[in-house]
Amino acid sequence: MAVVHSAPKYASNDGVRGTLVKALGDYVAASHEKYGEIIITVERDAIEDVLRTLRDDHDYQQLMEIAGVDYPERPERFEVVYMLLSLTKNHRVMVKVSTDEKTPVPTVTTLWPNAGWLEREVFDLYGVLFDGNTDLRRILTDYGFEGHPFRKDFPLTGYTELRYSEEEQRVVYEPVELAQDLRTFDFLSPWEGMTPPLPGDEKADMPPIDDPMVTEGPEDTGAGARANAKAAEGTPADPPAMDDEEEDDA
């Protein structure tokens, strides 16, 4: 009789961080656990060796994602985050490195082929360079796009706009022209408001109104006097009866 094994349950983090930090040794710059995730920061130049160790010796077989984060105030403003999954242990771990605009991060396409597209995405959106990636082209933005749109200093409006020109009968690119500077408005979420509000974001009281506008009848809304008579007719309490043919069609 065949024995059916269920999928492994979500593994506990107990002891995992200590084991991995010990295995990675001097490569580790910092480690912590947050929101149930183990996060290990390592030296940038060691990222390939670190991920190879996690894949080959600790069963993190899959590279699920590579993400970028921008912290403009830091000397090395970018973080590159690698998210690994162990199928056999049903466990995840995140590994991070930091870099700046000019210093490349070693590619991990030597370990996972899918890293090629993931590294291209981080390059396209943040401008992070990956040494050894032989196809480091843009992957999400349009041809001829300038800049990296996920950087914190990239304007929300962008630099160019795309529209269809009736005169030229084609799509054209033009520099963004704003009649006034872009303004952003903070609105409180109906589910989770900010507590306390940001300075200057306090809500103002409504000004007093001496003669409030009220509507006594439909004509006050601009619908005209005939709207009063139509409203007075009302609607029948019961819907009109359908004949047999209409009932059959229904």
From Swiss-Prot:
Membrane topology label: Peripheral membrane protein
Listed EC numbers: 7.1.1.-
Any one GO cellular component localisation term in the record: plasma membrane
Enzyme class: translocase
GO molecular function: NADH dehydrogenase (ubiquinone) activity; NADH:ubiquinone reductase (non-electrogenic) activity; quinone binding
Gene3D superfamilies (alphabetical): NADH:ubiquinone oxidoreductase, 30kDa subunit
Alphabetized UniProt keyword annotations: Cell inner membrane, Cell membrane, Membrane, NAD, Quinone, Translocase, Transport, Ubiquinone
Cellular compartment(s): Cell inner membrane
Source species, domain of life: Bacteria
InterPro entries: NADH_DH_suC, NADH_quin_OxRdtase_su_C/D-like, NADH_UbQ_OxRdtase_30kDa_su
Family matches, as Pfam families: Complex1_30kDa
Region (Disordered): 193-250
Keyword Cell membrane among UniProt keywords: yes
Biased amino acid composition, Low complexity: 222-236
Subunit structure: NDH-1 is composed of 14 different subunits. Subunits NuoB, C, D, E, F, and G constitute the peripheral sector of the complex.
Task of the protein: NDH-1 shuttles electrons from NADH, via FMN and iron-sulfur (Fe-S) centers, to quinones in the respiratory chain. The immediate electron acceptor for the enzyme in this species is believed to be ubiquinone. Couples the redox reaction to proton translocation (for every two electrons transferred, four hydrogen ions are translocated across the cytoplasmic membrane), and thus conserves the redox energy in a proton gradient.
Family stated for the protein in its record: Belongs to the complex I 30 kDa subunit family.
Name the record gives this protein: NADH-quinone oxidoreductase subunit C
Species name: Erythrobacter litoralis (strain HTCC2594)
Lineage of origin: Bacteria, Pseudomonadati, Pseudomonadota, Alphaproteobacteria, Sphingomonadales
